[in-house]
């Protein structure tokens, strides 16, 4: 697979929910394959929280192999950022000159980061993977543009988007579901 340039999207939460088994992630990584993280979609996972996916990606493999050395927090963060970007051919995933500025700012004053030893990067990575969730993100920057600041969206009316999404979903359901009167 490495010779063909195959890119892997590891979706541990949706695979578990759907009963699809556990990917051979340690073997893929040891073989030098590029593995990113994903969540599939809401209908396969019920969550789009990549922090939960990071946690599950680490814990699933540690528990199933009875080996706490697997999928260390910095490696899992790399899978969620750099590896995913590389797999998709995006110019993101790391902070470097010439790359798009896609960045999240995480509120380390959030209770999920307590206690915090900021001088210890392994401790910070551990909090990101095992304690944080999407609600810890304070600011989101996409291609250098702030799209969320202080947990408030800056480019769209969030309530309106949610209402429109729910209306669209109801329209899809109405087309899919056979009315009870059709069975009589």
Name each model-derived stretch.
Residues 26-114:
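His/Asp/Glu-enriched, well-ordered alpha-helical/loop segment
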Residues 2-9, 30-35:
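Glycine-enriched alpha-helix->loop->beta-strand junction motifs that scaffold or abut catalytic
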Residues 22-26, 122-123:
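Charged helix-capping and loop-helix junction motifs
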Residues 81-184:
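Active-site microenvironment of metallo-dependent hydrolases
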Residues 8, 40, 144:
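Residue-level signal for inorganic ion chemistry
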Residues 17-19:
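Helical hairpin unit composed of two closely spaced alpha helices linked by a short loop
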Residues 9-10, 105:
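Conserved beta-strand positions in the central sheet of alpha/beta enzyme cores
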